[in-house]
């Protein structure tokens, strides 16, 4: 039996996710653990489910995800973009709706580097006039 699957890659901050969509009953597995077990936070789980809820396909696919790098927020954003790209490969007509919601565009914001002589990226040491 040949099982068709759609693949999508997502990135956010320093996280990258590989997403595989297969037809199924709505099971989401992240790094061989269930979605709720992996993230724990409901907000992160909501971010992951957003593209599926938008196109009403929550119970249509089983999703297998490998994600690495970054923290919880970055990983959730990377998975969301990966699911979006996989859905577009599955059905090209979903692209307009997903783009309108802002899920197709990669969030290019990165952590600003710390500068020499500053305490953080922009925080300067206290200035003394005299």
Curated annotation (Swiss-Prot):
Gene Ontology MF terms: RNA binding; structural constituent of ribosome
Alphabetical list of Pfam families matching this protein: Ribosomal_S9
GO biological process, one term: translation
InterPro entries, per the entry: Ribosomal_Su5_D2-typ_SF, Ribosomal_uS9, Ribosomal_uS9_bac/plastid, Ribosomal_uS9_CS, Ribsml_uS5_D2-typ_fold_subgr
GO CC annotations, alphabetized: cytosolic small ribosomal subunit
Alphabetical UniProt keywords: Ribonucleoprotein, Ribosomal protein
Gene3D superfamilies: 3.30.230.10
Source superkingdom: Bacteria
NCBIfam families, A to Z: PRK00132.1
Family: Belongs to the universal ribosomal protein uS9 family.
Name the record gives this protein: Small ribosomal subunit protein uS9
Taxon lineage: Bacteria, Pseudomonadati, Pseudomonadota, Gammaproteobacteria, Enterobacterales
Gene name of the record: rpsI
